[in-house]
Amino acid sequence: MGNTIFNYLSTLRIFSLIVCMLLILMCATHDIQAQNTLKEKQPSARSNTMTEKTNLSIGKKFPEVKDDSLEKTPVFLPDAARGKVTLIAVAFLRESQSQIDSWLEPFVESFGNKEGFTFYEVPMLHWGYKFMRFMIDGGMRAGIPQEKHKHVVTMYGDVEKYIKALNLDLRYGYAFLLDREGIIRWEGQGFSTPETLKALFETAERLAK
């Protein structure tokens, strides 16, 4: 009886390992395809191509995101930001990190310590990556200052749902400015510029009045 149980557990472990390997392979294939799209279509590593999108998401409520922050606390967006003017930066690829940083860092510097404002960074990953969450989130915790952990919420799930809901292109990072009710009032794509940052700041100040 004991040997039978151990044989069963051994078989179960092998099966689980195979499933995990297949999921990792699926995720890697998804990433390679996305990166190839990025390399083939992205016009410049430092471009900011707002002309490719007409801000169709403005006026919509930001779609619900439910996941844990790097602080290991559950966060429900946009409800967690209700009552505040909020910048949410979204990225799908590693290559987009510098793009969303170009929005987040100036915003945090100008509004991070002001009452009535908040911000979130939301990396969006395919659901298959959830099996590697402890490694991914652990690496992010090591590279991000602890005081910002509560502002980073990695979404593991149906990425395509958000791409369709907000009319997004996974090649780019995005910055969404929400009013106190969670409605998108301003949007930025790609890298920020002095002009687009000025527009972001002016809109944030107006929404706070």
What is the role of each PLM region?
Residues 35-63:
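N-proximal helix/coil linker or "cap" segments that precede and/or mark the start of modular domains
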Residues 65-85:
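A short beta-strand-turn-helix
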Residues 15-26:
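Bacterial N-terminal signal peptides
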Residues 95-145:
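Structural microenvironment flanking redox-active thiols in thiol-disulfide oxidoreductases
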